[in-house]
Amino acid sequence: GSSGLIPMPRV
């Protein structure tokens, strides 16, 4: 996912 302010899982 993304390692930013908001971690978003890869879907």
Curated annotation (Swiss-Prot):
The modification Valine amide is found at residue 11. Its main location: secreted. It comes from the Eukaryota. Signal peptide: none annotated. It is found in: Secreted. It holds the Pfam family Periviscerokin. InterPro entries: Periviscerokinin. Keywords: Amidation, Neuropeptide, Secreted. One of its GO terms (biological process) is neuropeptide signaling pathway. GO terms for cellular component: extracellular region. The keyword Heme does not apply. The keyword Secreted applies. Mediates visceral muscle contractile activity (myotropic activity). Belongs to the periviscerokinin family. This is Periviscerokinin-2. The lineage of its organism: Eukaryota, Metazoa, Ecdysozoa, Arthropoda, Hexapoda.
